Amino acid sequence: MLIRDVRPWGGPASDVVIEGGRISVVRPHDESVPLGAEDVEGRGRLLLPSFSDVHVHLDSTRIGLPFREHTGSPGVWGMMMNDRRNWRDTDVPHAEIVAGTLERMIARGTTRVRSYAQVDVDCKLEKFDAVMAAKERFADQAEVQIMTFPQAGILLEEGTVDYLEESLKQGADVMGGIDPSQLDRDPVKHLDIVFGLAEKYQVEIDIHLHEPGHLGVFSTELVLERVRALGMQGKVTMSHAYELGGVNEATSRRLIDEFAELDIAMASVAPAARNQLSLVDLVSSGVRFGLGEDGQRDYWSPYGNGDLLDRTWQLAFTNNFRRDEHIEMCLAIATMGGASIMSQASPRLTGVQDRPGTAVGDRADLVLVDGETPTSAVMDRGTDRTVLHDGRVVADGLRVLAH
């Protein structure tokens, strides 16, 4: 396949050849080269790696349903109970809602997804099954990892552990944990279960951390100890963790250094939080960092629309970035930053200036988007997009193509 007249990361006009699902040639654009039936006319658009949403709750999405007033009360437990009371209040099959949101994400340029699937004594495996069905339905258009996620805690309701283990038996890719100290109030037992199941089923771990200040640092230190003791370097992600920068500068620096040493990744949803670890320092230190949309128009929040380019703008905005190099870094995070969380084989960001994902040998998961520069694309978030997964066009003009 030839992709003609595109600008990789805003560089010179180029023609890109795809073979075997990877980029095989990047050469100066030659208008005289004819297009074949399977080739793509770039029309001077930007060529970027496709987006990687590594923190999304497909299991709770309401995209496609009538908009409703937000009724959740503050706090993790209050929001979770709001979801529990309401998520079945529709005649639309849950699997169809989940699949519709995933389709919308693919159409807008996301081809790598790590989705939570809530597992507890209320929903049992219903939400997990819905996400699994969507994963299978769009297996040719996107790579989806499913995290079995104890949204209601692990220790608070008897039977939760059994459902978590059953989901791992049925193919969950990642073992989730949440607020070991604040929610379950027994971080040792909580982490015993999380790390024990991950080891038993040979999956990675993602810890959802909303805990504030010193408490969040304490829980994080317990995770660090286990990663070091169990040799799980490169297999753990800390999600949210938006208070870890609020204790003092020395603690922040120590945590960043330990994350880099132990290859612990971080995933953010670009919150308006003041106590986050420095994004520039994390990337400069080699910490894998990814972006996600979190819940999308669900019982937790009315935000989210399936477009990770919008969330890239939010990441830049909430970090008060103005310089092009920092805004482009946000694009690199939203694309290859997340890809490196989902696969150790993906190119990593090596610093603020790094723009991986469009070189010879890279996997041909790509998105063509209109924009004068990568920064302008983040500002304007145009809709003229063509999406490739494994070297095949899977979406064009915000529509997923049939295969």
Residue map of PLM features:
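N-terminal metal-binding scaffold of metallo-dependent hydrolase/deaminase domains
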Residues: 1-34, 374
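Divalent metal-coordination and catalytic microenvironments
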Residues: 6, 21, 44, 55, ...
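Active-site gating loops and adjacent loop-to-helix segments of metal-dependent hydrolytic enzymes
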Residues: 62-94, 201, 219-237, 255-258, ...
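Alpha-helical scaffold segments that flank or form the walls of functional sites
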Residues: 64-116, 122-137, 162-169
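Active-site core of metal-dependent hydrolases
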Residues: 148-158, 169-277, 288, 297
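His/Asp/Glu-enriched, well-ordered alpha-helical/loop segment
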Residues: 225-236, 280-371
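C-terminal cap of metal-dependent C-N hydrolases
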Residues: 347-403
